[in-house]
Amino acid sequence: MKRGYLHSIGRLRHVLRLCALALVLALTPVIIKADDDNLLKVDRVDFSVTLSDGNAYTIAGFLYYKGSFRNRPLQVLVHGGSYNHKYWDAPTINGQSYSYARFMAEEGYALLAIDQLGAGESSKPAGDFVTLNETTLSIHQVLAQMRSGNNPLGYAFQQIVLVGHSFGSINSIFVQGTFHDADALVVTALGHVPHELPIPPELIIALAQFPYFPLPAEARSALFYFADAADADVIAYDNLNLADLLTRGQLFTTFAAVFNPAADRVGAVTGPVLVQLGEHDSLWPSLYAGGEAAFWTNASSVTVESLPIVGHAFNTHLDNKTGWKSINRWIRSTLAVN
């Protein structure tokens, strides 16, 4: 009898193990799906654009989102000169996060960080062809594709915010003033109040000898960083891994539009605008923030913010999140995003 009792106990344990295994197998797809919904993803998305010469070119984009990109506001990120899309997705260094794209994806946005014409993995036509007009025409076509659904994702975004940095801000202003593609515009590290820029004329003359050229590391460090508010390891990483090339066409057209409101079409921009200027930006400091709003004569609203403790490359300074959080609040308020 004892032997039969022990045998029954053994069978019961075996059955319980099988039931437990079946339960685990039944729940496994649900667990994987839950993990997948919480996963931050980055997808390569290429756009075909046609420029003034009638030829097709490729603009490389990188889509950041968490779970799904559907039913989310889209931020289209436009990097500045001598950068590519990686400006928006610098890594964590010494425990500090420097990725604007990943920060905003965690906040519920979809973000398309593009490599502008002539930079990163986008097409590289002749350097003199890559001008303000051609660059902005390519950005316009990317925005139109994302709005219409005629894009590699096959999805039409209902709310689009155009976000620029430095030269990318000039291009974004021109696009919005010409085509009005976005629902809102965020301009960082770029102002319109005339002042002297700390760029030696001899440097410009030297760079203009080449159709594509890098900015020297010493110049990038001095112009883009407020050393007291940045990690030296990040500055070194920037020069080694984030730096890209500029074109002579951009030098003579985009740079020439810096303090020319008619050239960048700031007065033709409609819709809401947020401008962020850094206190220690050696190129466009917040010292001139008080006069900035006057240039946006047709914008439905203009908010100008001064950010302390940052230099020109906002994202790669230690206090980057002050500006990021403010952009997030402004977009949510402006577009009524939940």
Give each language-model segment a name.
Residues 163-248:
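Alpha/beta-hydrolase-fold enzymes
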Residues 129-152:
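Alpha/beta-hydrolase active-site loop
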Residues 278, 282-290:
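Conserved alpha/beta-hydrolase "acid-adjacent" motif
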Residues 310-321:
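Catalytic histidine-centered segment of alpha/beta-hydrolase-like enzymes
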